């Protein structure tokens, strides 16, 4: 004797949240499955660019100094106004934020200066 889908749906519809939770656990044990949500890959670069454009504040992060460390230190000094020692410590401690809470234009400008000096930079 088979039970119709409508009968099952009607039974589930009348259950409380606690009863539904117990039902899900019983399904997991009986069939060896998990009710955890599956992570779905989002759109590639287009989606990330759209999300970045919606942000109003950015953090410029120095990911890696690269091979021309002196030029990167000079760029950090120019962007932040730090002294030589502070700029060198920041570059040596990469990955570190260079500027925080800046608008898109300032973040892009700082990123360009650092990349032109040979650094790897991320905007967050």
From Swiss-Prot:
List the InterPro entries: Ribosomal_bL12, Ribosomal_bL12_C, Ribosomal_bL12_C/ClpS-like, Ribosomal_bL12_oligo, Ribosomal_bL12_oligo_N_sf
What keywords were assigned to this record?
Ribonucleoprotein, Ribosomal protein
In its UniProt record, which GO terms are filed under biological process?
Answer: translation
Domain of life, per UniProt, equals Bacteria
GO molecular function terms attached to this record: mRNA binding; structural constituent of ribosome
A cellular component term from Gene Ontology for this protein is: cytosolic large ribosomal subunit
Query: Do the record's keywords include Transferase?
Result: no
* Record function comment: Forms part of the ribosomal stalk which helps the ribosome interact with GTP-bound translation factors. Is thus essential for accurate translation.
Q: How does it assemble?
A: Homodimer. Part of the ribosomal stalk of the 50S ribosomal subunit. Forms a multimeric L10(L12)X complex, where L10 forms an elongated spine to which 2 to 4 L12 dimers bind in a sequential fashion. Binds GTP-bound translation factors.
Q: Which family does it belong to?
A: Belongs to the bacterial ribosomal protein bL12 family.
Tell me what this protein is called: Large ribosomal subunit protein bL12
Q: What is the lineage of its organism?
A: Bacteria, Pseudomonadati, Pseudomonadota, Betaproteobacteria, Burkholderiales
């Amino acid at each position: 004797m088979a039970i119709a889908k409508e009968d099952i749906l009607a039974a589930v519809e009348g259950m409380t949240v606690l009863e539904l939770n117990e039902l899900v656990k019983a399904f997991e044990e009986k069939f060896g499955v998990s009710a955890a949500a599956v992570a779905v890959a989002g759109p590639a670069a287009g989606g990330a660019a759209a999300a970045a454009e919606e942000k109003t504040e950015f953090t410029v992060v120095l990911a890696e100094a690269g091979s021309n460390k002196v030029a990167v230190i000079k760029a950090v000094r120019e962007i932040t106004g730090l002294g030589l020692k502070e700029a060198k410590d920041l570059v040596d401690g990469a990955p570190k934020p260079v500027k925080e809470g800046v608008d898109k234009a300032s973040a892009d400008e700082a990123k360009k200066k650092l990349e032109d000096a040979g650094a790897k930079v991320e905007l967050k």
